């Protein structure tokens, strides 16, 4: 229910974090980032599409994570606002708690949760070619 107001192909111009480790065994991926043209700007951004919004439900709790919203204008986006409102409703226990891990189904096959993105980032930091 947290993504009910976000359409497929939703686009936002924002700064984003390059994650190097994921908790793939507990993540329920809700949205993937497509770095688009950024892939060609620096080797460290030449990564597969990867999770930027996810949730989990450890025990009786609920966790929602969103890596977006660095730019002020993103917070003015109606879909972004609706998503956060829905997410806060969900995290306080309302609605279905379906947050089963879905890494195998949702993440690109070439995104390794432990070493894939980390290898690219480490190579860029050390001025080495990414492999």
Task: For the regions a language model picked out, list residue spans one by one.
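Catalytic beta-strand/loop cores that center a nucleophilic Ser/Cys/Thr
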Residues: 1-59
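Extracellular ligand-binding/catalytic regions of CAZymes and related secreted enzymes
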Residues: 36-53, 57-131
């Amino acid at each position: 229910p947290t993504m009910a107001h976000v359409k497929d192909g939703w686009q936002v111009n924002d700064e984003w974090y390059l994650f190097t480790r994921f908790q793939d065994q507990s993540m329920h991926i809700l949205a993937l980032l497509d770095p688009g043209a950024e892939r060609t700007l620096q080797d460290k951004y030449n990564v597969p599409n990867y999770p930027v919004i996810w949730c989990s439900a450890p025990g009786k709790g609920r966790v929602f994570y969103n890596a977006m919203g660095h730019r002020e204008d993103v917070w003015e986006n109606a879909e972004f606002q609706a998503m956060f409102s829905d997410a806060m409703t969900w995290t306080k226990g309302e609605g279905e708690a379906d947050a089963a891990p879905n890494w195998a189904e949702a993440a690109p096959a070439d995104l390794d949760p432990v070493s894939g993105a980390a290898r690219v980032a480490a190579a860029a930091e050390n001025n080495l070619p990414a492999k």
